[in-house]
A protein has these predicted regions:
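N-terminal [4Fe-4S]-dependent radical SAM core
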Residues: 1-45, 73-77, 85, 110-112
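Intrinsic-disorder-associated, low-complexity terminal segments enriched in Asp/Asn/His/Tyr and depleted
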Residues: 9, 14, 83, 317, ...
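Residue-level signal for threonine
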Residues: 76-79, 257
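C-terminal scaffold of the Radical SAM
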Residues: 28-43, 61-72, 87-107, 112-309, ...
Length: 330
């Protein structure tokens, strides 16, 4: 969905490659970590790849098909963009089947009692509520949720509905990360983001109504056509929503993305380095003045609510990649 998030950046591999398996039966990324099978996994990342649109800057693994949007999200998206995704696909159920099977195996191999759990994408909130219930119930049954202190789900603003958010809260989700990116329609159009800027505020209100008060906003600066004035306007709007956390990334022209192709064709121009540095410095200054702790390059948390932890181990599970990393900050 977006180049996010506040706590976890997911690794990407060739979407066409399947993990190789050695004689001990573990996928290749886990071969060198078999010795930690008795250790506790402190952080877990799950990847839900479905999207109904590929944003031009995004290089994350995703499956783009209008059929992936469930009914309520489809209606919201069609009102905003004129596109009309259809009802939930059967493949969502198949995906959840396989994800549950893999989590079951991982729970057998590792002590899978994470303190932090992050579900990214893709657009995780395109999974229908019934599939979310299946996944959450399975994780509860496997004991994965018993030690979780922070359970984040990534969402595009237009997919946040009260029934779905209530389902997530009932399953233990206590944090949402919203892909706002910008509040300027022209800049959203440059990024090929379909949502209405007003949908971010609506999503924040919906999350809070459902009981989620820990809210992150993802934003991007150094967007082609952005000025210091529009950057300030984005900061003003973001802060008006009183998030507990902000992730602010500079736009990266990743290889093999539509944005990079547009750059090569002269359709967009990248920000000059000096202006980009000035924008970053301005973000740092504004957020410090607003009471945010700058604890990582692109991440800020409110000082009164921040909790920083260094993970001893984190397991990332997603289509085409499984990875175990050490000493990651969340």
């Amino acid at each position: 969905m977006s180049r996010t998030s506040s706590t976890v950046d997911s690794p990407q591999k060739d979407a066409g490659s399947a993990p190789s398996v050695k004689s001990n039966g573990l996928p290749w990324p886990l071969q060198d970590h078999a010795a930690v099978s008795a250790a506790t996994i402190d952080g877990l990342y799950l990847h839900i790849p479905f999207c109904f649109h590929k944003c031009h800057y995004c290089d994350f693994y995703s499956i783009v098909d209008a059929e992936h949007a469930p009914g309520e999200a489809a209606e919201a998206a069609s009102q905003i963009s004129g596109h009309s995704p259809t009802s939930p696909p059967a493949r969502a159920a198949v995906f959840v089947d396989r994800l549950i099977a893999e989590l079951t195996e991982l729970a057998r191999l590792f002590t899978l009692h994470p303190r932090t759990l992050f579900v990214g994408g893709g657009t995780p909130t395109l999974l229908p509520a019934d599939q979310w219930r299946r996944l959450l119930d399975a994780m509860k049954g496997l004991g994965i949720l018993q030690r979780v202190r922070e359970f984040t789900v990534e969402a595009n603003p237009e997919t946040v509905t009260l029934p779905l958010t209530q389902t997530l809260v009932e399953g233990g989700v206590n944090r949402v990360s919203l892909g706002a990116q910008s509040f300027q329609p022209a800049l959203l159009a440059t990024l090929e983001r379909w949502h209405d800027p007003a949908s971010v505020g609506a999503a924040v209100r919906t999350a809070r109504e459902a009981g989620i008060t820990n809210i992150n906003l993802d934003l991007i600066f150094a967007i082609p056509g952005q000025t210091m004035a529009t950057l300030d306007a984005d900061l003003d709007t973001a802060l008006s929503h009183a998030p507990s956390h902000l992730s602010y990334y500079s736009l990266i022209f990743e290889p093999n993305t539509a944005m990079t192709q547009r750059l090569k064709m002269g359709q967009v121009q990248s920000m000059d380095e000096e202006t980009e540095r000035e924008m970053y410095a301005h973000v740092i200054e504004r957020l410090a003045a607003a009471g945010f702790e700058h604890y990582e390059v692109s991440n800020w948390a409110r000082k009164e609510s921040s909790e920083f932890k260094v993970q001893s181990s984190e397991l990332r599970n997603q289509p085409s990649a499984t990875d175990l990393n050490s000493e990651l900050r969340t």
